[in-house]
UniProtKB/Swiss-Prot annotation:
It comes from Escherichia coli (strain K12). Part of a heterotetrameric complex that catalyzes the two-step biosynthesis of anthranilate, an intermediate in the biosynthesis of L-tryptophan. In the first step, the glutamine-binding beta subunit (TrpG) of anthranilate synthase (AS) provides the glutamine amidotransferase activity which generates ammonia as a substrate that, along with chorismate, is used in the second step, catalyzed by the large alpha subunit of AS (TrpE) to produce anthranilate. In the absence of TrpG, TrpE can synthesize anthranilate directly from chorismate and high concentrations of ammonia. L-glutamine binds at residues 57-59, 88, 134-135. Residues 202-531 are annotated as: Anthranilate phosphoribosyltransferase. GO terms for cellular component: anthranilate synthase complex. This is Bifunctional protein TrpGD.
């Protein structure tokens, strides 16, 4: 018998569902979604075998009261079952996309195909079910198993380790012929507790034997890492094993999706936007070119949600510089989204969104060597941008990171390295791996391709956050050094290409005109004024 807290998303089906569950002997309490999430979490803590069930409902998941917050705070901590709107909320919470299904269904019987596993074990296949929906989940992340579908549309998902699952259809409906049995098998599956040590040991053994993990195995491993379920010695051994063999794109993608799924949510816009970011660790100690480029790109009409952190290896990371400008690193997600909408730029401070990183920090500090975590930063932007310009500290990483971006489903992106720097530069050829609609093209760019004068790397040397702030203030006000102007122009020109403006030379000239107008600095002061 389960103790079920049924979240009512203001839908009459909630009570049909409650009647079905109670008829099978389960305890059910119902709360509407306008109740604060904290109140419901405290109520769940008083229940002996708690299961959170998310009801159907109108609208979209983000507008369903406390449901998104409950998913963020509780997944992996107790079983969660979502139905229709609840299923869509689960898809979004794990990094998937919810959009129009192409038709509006109200009480239509469809025969779905399922995998015959877990809650679907022993059920008729195809299984007649009742569908009431106009939205559907897609771009399902690696951590979720798609266990039922209809004509290519996702009808059910599950996360085995977290004991979270969702049904797009209505199991409580009379049109779902084996719905009562499905609900009982789902509750039985949900209440089976997996021991992390037991489920992770085969994955660790593969690493010790220098074998490559699948994306799902890597996802499972790093989900345990960010939840603090791995012992320090296990994490150290796993990271070193992967480093010695060389990290595979599927392993990087699995780790990235695990961190994204466990990140604090950001209200993702439906318009085109990008990130421009570097891994750091190139040892160049240059001015913060990508951060300056984000403001200039916004002044050029692009939208940039830049993800960043404080510096580890240089004097000034992106967040160090922003703090020196008086920009609030702890700005909440809604205010950051508003800045992106209105100013064209926002900054998402990594520790605010990825609190699970703290479990790995002691091991990373003890190892004192680069590991997979060093390349994850640019890949775990909680806004899930469809476009990205990513610089890497080593030319050997250019193609693997591009392949990882393909696995992660980016629409268009470029991974670059140039003469020891993790960005487009003009002192040496820039190595590029560009992803566009699933295809990766490798090429090189020089200063001539941008119509710009080459400069020496030493001319881009930076200093402390305060020194870089002063340098970039002059640059963004249109009074900057020519080498600094050219560096930013090249990077923003490349970002413009990812938005469909293919002519790099024309792009660079546009950027220089905007830079010299001083309008980019207005974005800095406006963002700082938002507090």
């Amino acid at each position: 018998m389960a103790d079920i807290l049924l979240l009512d998303n203001i839908d009459s089906f909630t009570y049909n569902l409650a009647d079905q569950l109670r008829s099978n002997g389960h305890n059910v309490v119902i709360y509407r979604n306008h109740i604060p999430a904290q109140t419901l979490i405290e109520r769940l803590a008083t229940m002996s075998n708690p299961v959170l069930m998310l009801s159907p409902g109108p609208g979209v998941p983000s507008e369903a009261g406390c449901m998104p917050e409950l998913l963020t705070r509780l997944r992996g901590k107790l079983p969660i079952i979502g139905i229709c709107l609840g299923h869509q909320a689960i898809v979004e919470a794990y990094g998937g996309y919810v959009g129009q299904a192409g038709e509006i269904l109200h009480g239509k019987a469809s025969s779905i195909e399922h995998d015959g596993q877990a809650m679907f074990a022993g059920l008729t296949n195809p299984l007649p079910v009742a569908r009431y929906h106009s939205l559907v989940g897609s771009n399902i992340p690696a951590g979720l198993t798609i266990n039922a579908h209809f004509n290519g549309m996702v009808m059910a998902v599950r996360h085995d380790a977290d004991r979270v699952c969702g049904f797009q259809f209505h199991p409580e409906s009379i049109l779902t012929t084996q719905g009562a049995r499905l609900l009982e098998q789902t509750l039985a599956w949900a209440q089976q507790k997996l021991e992390p040590a037991n489920t992770l040991q085969p994955i660790l053994e593969k690493l010790y034997q220098a074998q490559t993990l699948s994306q799902q195995e890597s996802h499972q491993l790093f989900s345990a890492v960010v939840r603090g379920e791995l012992k320090p010695e296990q994490l150290a051994a796993a990271l070193v094993s992967m480093k010695i063999r060389g990290e595979h794109p599927n392993e990087i993608a699995g780790a990235a999706t695990a961190l994204l799924e466990n990140a604090a949510p950001f209200p993702r816009p439906d318009y085109l936007f990008a990130d421009i970011v570097g891994t750091g660790g190139d040892g160049s100690n240059s001015i913060n070119i990508s951060t300056a480029s984000a403001f200039v790109a916004a002044a050029c009409g692009l939208k940039v949600a830049k993800h960043g952190n404080r510096s580890v290896s240089s004097k000034s990371g992106s967040s160090d510089l922003l703090a020196a400008f008086g920009i609030n690193l702890d700005m909440n997600a809604d205010k950051s989204r508003q800045a992106l909408d209105e100013l064209g730029v926002c900054f998402l401070f990594a520790p605010k969104y990825h609190t699970g990183f703290r479990h790995a920090m002691p091991v990373r500090q003890q190892l004192k060597t680069r590991t997979l975590f060093n390349v994850l930063g640019p890949l775990i932007n909680p806004a899930h941008p469809p476009l990205a310009l990513i610089g890497v500290y080593s030319p050997e990483l250019v193609l693997p990171i591009a392949e990882t971006l393909r696995v992660l489903g980016y629409q268009r992106a470029a991974v670059v390295h140039s003469g020891g720097m993790d960005e487009v530069s003009l002192h040496a050829p820039t190595i590029v791996a560009e992803l566009h609609d699933g295809e990766i093209k490798s090429y090189q760019l020089t200063a001539e391709d941008f119509g710009l004068t080459p400069y020496h790397q030493e001319q881009l040397a930076g200093g402390t956050p305060e020194e870089n702030r002063d340098i970039l203030t002059r640059l963004l006000q249109g009074k900057g050094d020519a080498a600094h102007e050219a560096a930013v122009a090249a990077n923003v020109a490349m970002l413009m290409r990812l938005h469909g403006h293919e002519d790099l030379q024309a792009n660079a000239q546009t950027v220089l005109e905007v830079l010299r107008s001083g309008s980019a600095y207005d974005r800095v002061t406006a963002l700082a004024a938002r507090g």
